[in-house]
Amino acid sequence: MLLACGAVLGGAGCNNAVVVQLMTGNQTFEVTTSSVEIPAQLQAEGTIASVPCPTGMCPSTDTLPLACVSGVCDPEPRTIAVPVGDVVDFDVLLREASTILRFVDAIEVTRVQYAASPNSLNVDVPDIEVFWGPDTAAGIDAPGVFRLGVIPALPAGTAREGDMQIDADGSAALSDHVVGGNRRVRFFARTSIDLDPGDPIPMGGATVTVNLTVRAIGRILE
């Protein structure tokens, strides 16, 4: 949708300068407990057992690292990192918006709406970081991946929606990437599950969607 036309490019007039608003549509990912396996020796009637470690050592497990904290074996946080949705192509978004914008001089992520529903997790999930990277990126640790923002923590079993906190540096890097000619990007999410003795054995999952609103500034064909 064409939003404005004016001298937004340092002297350019309405004949060749336009501002358009684009939306990526919902990009979806799952936060699940499937990767968190609790060894039998750490289970006690549906909860994380309190296993003493008087010598400062905890049982060795292949599935869940443990640390001796205050004399009790405490599971270390388990990181969860997943892809978010599909590759987003800004050229396609421009075409679908039926704009006449052909040369992009800057973009700005103005809003990222999120929704977490349904949420069947029986444990709280801390803040969820959302990242963007080139379409060739295989994960968060790949070159050219930047943090785009943070979704607030999700309480167990609670559906949530709202606006993600946007990282200004990550948004600026996304603008440089798109202006540089690579219009295809993908997204990733990262959070963790941190369990304490006495917590329930983790189960369930949450479906989370993010939808970016982007302001694109550019020019029409000259």
Predicted regions and their residues:
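Extended, low-complexity, turn-rich repeat/linker tracts enriched in Gly/Pro/Ser/Thr and Asp/Glu
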Residues: 115-126, 195-199
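N-terminal Sec signal peptide cleavage junction
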Residues: 5, 12-14
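Short beta-strands within extracellular/lumenal beta-sheet-rich domains
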Residues: 75-104
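A short beta-strand element within beta-rich, extracytoplasmic domains
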Residues: 103-120
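Short, low-complexity, Pro/Ser/Thr/Gly-rich segments in the mature regions of secreted, periplasmic
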Residues: 209-222
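N-terminal leader/pro-regions and domain N-caps
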Residues: 14-75
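Short, surface-exposed beta-strand/strand-loop-strand elements in extracellular ectodomains
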Residues: 121-139
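Cysteine-clustered segments with highest specificity for TGF-beta superfamily mature ligands
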Residues: 152-211
